[in-house]
């Protein structure tokens, strides 16, 4: 990590946040979250700042999520830094969600986990032909956090549940079709659009509207009927049964993906989306997600998931437990239960 992991700059009425860890696919750290929080706080009350942009400096990914290798090391050392990261990250998500000034995130390249958490709260979200959007956390023993309980549960039909359980990747056209993105631009147009916004930040919305392009056809519409029918249940056992009863290759592929995921994480994710959809305030959703993450990072699955896919890279995690029917409803309820008052998450500033 260096002082330049995130570049914070303001000029001519525009606040710029540029992620700058290309070798790590711009994975987020606690320090990066703290810097973004400080900048947004300052710019929100500065009358000279008309708009805020979020992008990345270079490379094939906007943001691959939180730096799970650092989280792994923190949990191994039992130094408490992992939980501190999530506390700060969720405050950053909430601050961007409640921001009153126009903001735009350029979702060019990989947008996963914490990257989605940076992008989704922004008023404008620009996808490109290189966008690869996913919430793959159930595959490493976690759950689709950073506001996933809010925005996944509000996607059409059962697309959010499908994404949470399979880690499915969406392209830029899919993101636009689902309102995960508000605009679609070819990658080659981004530099000119950013230049125009830099010169006229007060005209951000008009600049994006004029520059937007028509994406190629989205394939997500072709899958809607299958997704809504086969992922209709809120119990993972019922979803698996529906997929097993279907004879299509697509259903078999979804079963294969779900089989790779941590059973506890899958059950948590489905319940998270049920409860997240019922939240009337984003802060309530984030408080729920902090309760979840504070429990899940202490369970063996997260350590095992990172070991299998990041550290040893044998791609063979041994989940505990290994089967869905071994995860009890009492265990899930305990994961969602309130924390002691002094340990609860709270937003910065307004709710």
Positions of the model-derived regions?
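Amphipathic alpha-helical blocks and their helix-capping loop/short-beta junctions
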Residues: 180-261
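Hydrophobic/aromatic residues within transmembrane alpha-helices
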Residues: 54, 67, 118-119, 174-175, ...
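Conserved CoA-thioester-binding segment of acyl-CoA-metabolizing enzymes
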Residues: 1-55, 80, 94, 347-351
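Hydrophobic, secondary-structure "cap" segments at the distal end of domains
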Residues: 149-158
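Glycine-rich beta-to-alpha active-site loop
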Residues: 96-140, 162-168, 172
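C-terminal amphipathic alpha-helical interaction region
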Residues: 292, 300, 304-351
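Gly/Pro- and small hydrophobic-enriched strand-loop and loop-to-helix capping segments
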Residues: 122-144, 179-194
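Glycine- (often His-adjacent) and acidic-residue-rich active-site loop
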Residues: 56-91, 139-141, 335
């Amino acid at each position: 990590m260096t002082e330049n992991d995130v570049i914070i700059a303001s000029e001519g009425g525009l606040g710029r946040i540029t992620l700058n860890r290309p070798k790590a696919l711009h994975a987020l750290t606690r320090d990066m979250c703290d810097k973004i929080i400080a900048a947004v706080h300052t710019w929100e009350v500065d009358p000279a700042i008309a708009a805020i942009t979020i992008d990345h400096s270079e490379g094939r990914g906007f943001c691959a999520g939180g730096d799970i290798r650092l989280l792994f090391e923190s949990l191994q050392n039992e130094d408490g830094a992992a939980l501190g990261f999530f506390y700060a990250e969720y405050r950053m998500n909430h601050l961007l969600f409640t921001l009153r000034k126009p903001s735009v995130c350029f979702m060019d390249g990989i947008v996963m986990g914490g990257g989605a958490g940076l992008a989704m709260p922004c008023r404008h979200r620009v996808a490109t032909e290189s966008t690869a959007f996913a919430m793959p956390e159930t595959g490493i023993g976690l759950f689709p956090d950073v506001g996933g309980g809010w925005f996944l549960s509000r996607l059409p039909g059962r697309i959010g549940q499908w994404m949470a359980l399979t880690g499915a990747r969406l392209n830029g056209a899919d993101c636009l079709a689902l309102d995960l993105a508000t605009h679609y631009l070819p990658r080659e147009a981004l530099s000119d659009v950013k230049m125009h916004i830099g010169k006229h930040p007060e005209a951000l919305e008009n600049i994006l509207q004029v520059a937007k392009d028509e994406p190629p056809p989205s394939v997500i519409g072709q899958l809607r009927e299958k997704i809504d029918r086969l992922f209709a249940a809120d119990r993972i056992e019922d979803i698996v049964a529906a997929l097993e009863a279907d004879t299509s290759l697509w259903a078999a592929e979804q079963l294969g993906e779900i089989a790779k995921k941590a059973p506890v994480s899958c059950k948590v994710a489905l319940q998270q989306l049920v409860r997240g959809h019922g939240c009337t305030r984003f802060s309530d959703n984030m408080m729920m997600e902090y309760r979840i993450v504070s429990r899940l990072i202490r369970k063996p699955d997260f350590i095992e998931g990172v070991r299998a896919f990041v550290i040893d890279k044998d791609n063979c995690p041994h989940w505990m437990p290994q089967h869905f029917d071994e995860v009890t409803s009492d265990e899930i309820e305990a994961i969602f239960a309130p924390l002691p008052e002094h340990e609860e998450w709270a937003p910065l500033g307004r709710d």
